[in-house]
């Protein structure tokens, strides 16, 4: 588990067993606390410090719940060896798909509120997943779907497994089985 969600499998990080260094590991930075701060202010006041941390790691993951589309160009320039990028509900998912192409893992943070009710709107869940997946397929994105931050399932634990079923169906519909 790395960053704000996801699995960090990679063949790009190599270390000597028993002598692992930061350069052999994933780094993670985010700025969700600055979601209402302008991209220019993030560039000036936050990214220089995040760059200093990120340069110590072999690969980097960036983002959590902040909308990334408005600050993407600055993040891309500041964070070395960036491989994974969080695309939250507060980002323009289409723009992020175009920006990331096949160069980064598109870590799509699905809204946990979709399954936080007793009876989820399955058609809405399906439609939203399909919109994102279709866009990502067109742009050649490497997509990861992340359902997290579930503090309640509307007293219906089946919501989680049903969401997985729907997600698998939509992935198969867009990408084939």
Descriptions of predicted regions:
Residues 1-177:
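Active-site loop segments of alpha/beta catalytic cores
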């Amino acid at each position: 588990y790395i960053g704000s969600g996801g699995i960090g499998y990679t063949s790009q990080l190599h270390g000597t067993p028993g002598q692992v260094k930061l350069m052999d590991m994933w780094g993670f930075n985010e700025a969700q606390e600055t979601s209402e701060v302008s991209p220019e202010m993030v560039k000036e006041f936050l990214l220089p410090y995040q760059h200093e941390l990120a340069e110590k790691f072999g690969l980097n993951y960036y983002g959590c719940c902040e909308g990334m589309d408005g600050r993407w160009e600055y993040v891309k320039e500041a964070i070395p060896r960036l491989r994974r990028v969080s695309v939250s509900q507060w980002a323009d998912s289409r723009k992020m798909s175009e920006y990331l192409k096949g160069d980064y893992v598109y870590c799509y943070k699905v809204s946990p509120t979709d399954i936080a009710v007793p009876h989820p709107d399955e058609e809405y869940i399906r439609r939203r997943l399909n919109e994102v997946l279709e866009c990502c397929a067109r742009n050649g994105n490497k997509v990861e779907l992340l359902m997290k931050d579930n503090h309640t399932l509307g007293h219906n634990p089946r919501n989680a497994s049903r969401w997985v079923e729907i997600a698998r169906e939509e992935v198969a519909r867009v990408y084939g089985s």
